[in-house]
Amino acid sequence: MAPNIRKSHPLLKMINNSLIDLPAPSNISAWWNFGSLLAVCLMTQILTGLLLAMHYTADTSLAFSSVAHTCRNVQYGWLIRNLHANGASFFFICIFLHIGRGLYYGSYLYKETWNTGVILLLTLMATAFVGYVLPWGQMSFWGATVITNLFSAIPYIGHTLVEWAWGGFSVDNPTLTRFFALHFLLPFAIAGITIIHLTFLHESGSNNPLGISSDSDKIPFHPYYSFKDILGLTLMLTPFLTLALFSPNLLGDPENFTPANPLVTPPHIKPEWYFLFAYAILRSIPNKLGGVLALAASVLILFLIPFLHKSKQRTMTFRPLSQTLFWLLVANLLILTWIGSQPVEHPFIIIGQMASLSYFTILLILFPTIGTLENKMLNY
């Protein structure tokens, strides 16, 4: 019998083993769709970003007007920009749901896959931050000023580090130029790390909602999950296009329609919605260094999750106490997101401090404690 080129060709067999003949658990739910959706988001962002970069000028005197020119005069420029801006929001929606799935179903026990995933999240956050600065509106400028200034809280080297990052004594032309360079480069780094992420995943195979070995009941990825992924894509595309075409500025800040002005500070400096939870944690601590450490810890804590797993069961499917705690954490993150968008005044300050404290308490103390308690309950 003639060899199948799909299985013998050096390049095609890699694609075959990753996307066609890959053995997958027969019972993975729609929560396993977000990985492929993230891949689609990345490809969309790289494509729209490339088209935008062709019309963008990374210069403080021209950046704002070059973006306006793209929207007004370039064929479908308005569409490309709206897809790119709102694509970032959907990228974060998908990654948050993907991480939530990992937490709920104990996927973090594949440590290498989990750690590369956390690195991907950090890289994505960096990419989104530098990208937000590029239109050079008021919130772009002041967001860049406030967030880069946080590095000055690092003892001894802080101020030097900030001036080195700025390329001067304030956020100015060199800052914009390097941020554009980074924003162009990082998505390709994300694509590279994604391949590493998948390589580690395919070493162990996918987890499943029961958290048990699925070796005895595997099905080929194609056609089952390839079609399921396409269904997931169409379901995501509907709200995405609705947002991008009907209310493209819903999630943006009106302040960014004003060109950057170092002499006028906006009344409320706040990042895009997907950073608000971390911003709320940063603001909840009155000390600058303490706030920066809490901000870093709010995301870096994900690296600790595999070590805080004390339950004898992998997933939360049959652990009602842990489930309650998980949804409490979700509610807590929504409260933090809301607080991050509010001004620093009573009662928002105390609510933010309580929510920040409970965020770390749930992850560091309550999850391991409840896991141990559930183990004990299994004996009775």
Swiss-Prot record:
Record bears the keyword Cell inner membrane: no
Membrane-topology descriptor: Multi-pass membrane protein
The organism's taxonomic lineage, starting at the top: Eukaryota, Metazoa, Chordata, Craniata, Vertebrata
Disulfide bridge positions per record: none
Cofactor info, note text: Binds 2 heme b groups non-covalently.
SUPFAM superfamilies membership: a domain/subunit of cytochrome bc1 complex (Ubiquinol-cytochrome c reductase), Transmembrane di-heme cytochromes
Classification via InterPro entries: Cyt_b/b6_C (IPR005798), Cyt_b/b6_C_sf (IPR036150), Cyt_b/b6_N (IPR005797), Cytb/b6-like_sf (IPR027387), Cytochrome_b (IPR030689), Cytochrome_b_C_euk/bac (IPR048260), Cytochrome_b_N_euk/bac (IPR048259), Di-haem_cyt_TM (IPR016174)
Database matches in Pfam families: Cytochrom_B_C, Cytochrome_B
Cofactor: heme b
GO biological process, one term: mitochondrial electron transport, ubiquinol to cytochrome c
Taxonomy, superkingdom: Eukaryota
Keyword terms, alphabetized: Electron transport, Heme, Iron, Membrane, Metal-binding, Mitochondrion, Mitochondrion inner membrane, Respiratory chain, Transmembrane, Transmembrane helix, Transport, Ubiquinone
UniProt name for this protein: Cytochrome b
Gene Ontology MF term list: heme binding; metal ion binding; ubiquinol-cytochrome-c reductase activity
Heme as UniProt keyword: yes
A GO CC term assigned to this protein in UniProt: mitochondrion
Residues binding a ubiquinone, per UniProt: H202
